[in-house]
C-alpha cells in the first residue's frame, strides 16, 4: 500500500524525463505522499506550460524568419532582373525609366522594412520607452507636417486638448503608421477621407484613425498585427508597405500598457482605436509644436 503511490510517482517522473510533460501522478490522499504528489503535479503542469510557451515562441520566430526572408527575396529577385536589363546596354528610354523607378521604389520599401524591424527589436529592451507629457494637438501638428499628401485623400485632424504621458517619438510613429494604412485603404477611391481624432473618455485619451476606404474582412481582423501579414499583398506592396506597420503599432501600444482595437466593414471603411490614460494636470508650458 505504501509503495504503490511511490511507484506511480516514479513512473510520472520517468515520463517527464522522457519528454512527456503531460505526465501526472493523479494521487489524491490525505497524507504526506498525497501532498508530495500534489506538489509534483503542480510542478509538472508549470513545466508543461512553460515548454509549450517555448515551443510557440520558436514557431513564431521560425515563421517570422521565413516571412522576412520571403519579403527580402521577392523584391531582390525583381531588382536583379531590372538591373540586368540596365547593364545589358542602351535600351528604350521608357523601359529604362520603368526599371529605374522599380528599383528605386523597392529600395525605399526595403529601407522602410529594415527601419521598422530595427524599431521592433529595440522595443524589446527595458528602456525602450521614455514617457513624458505630450498633448494631442502637438502630436497631430507633427503628423500634419511629416506626412506627405496622399493623392485623392482628405486628411482631417480633430484634437480635444488631451494630454497623455507617452514616448512622443514612438506614439507619433504609431499614429503615422495608422494614418498611412488608412490612406492606402482609400487609394483609388473617390472621396477618400481619413480622420485622426482624440477624445477624453473615462479618464483616458481615446485616439482614433478612421477611413472610408476598402475595409477589412472580419476573418482577417485577428491577424492584422502579425508581422508581414497583409490583407491585400498587391495593394500593400504597391503602396510601399512592408507588412510590419501594424505589428510595430501593436508593439508600441503594448509598451505603453494598451492595445489596438479594430472595427471594419468591407467597402465601408476601418476605425482603429487606442487609448492612453490622461496625464495628471500640472502647470507647465505647452510643448513645442
Q: Language-model features: where?
A:
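Short beta-strand/loop element within the Bergerat-fold HATPase_c
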Residues: 191-203
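C-terminal end segment of the histidine kinase catalytic
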Residues: 254-289
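Membrane-proximal HAMP signal-relay module
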Residues: 1-65, 80-87, 122, 227, ...
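Conserved micro-motifs of the catalytic ATP-binding
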Residues: 125-130, 163-166
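Short helix-loop "hinge" at the ATP-lid/N-box region of the Bergerat-fold HATPase_c
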Residues: 181-186
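Acidic ATP/Mg2+-coordinating residue in the GHKL
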Residues: 211
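Short alpha-helical segment of the dimerization/phosphotransfer core of two-component systems
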Residues: 105-110
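Short conserved segment of the HATPase_c
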Residues: 216-230
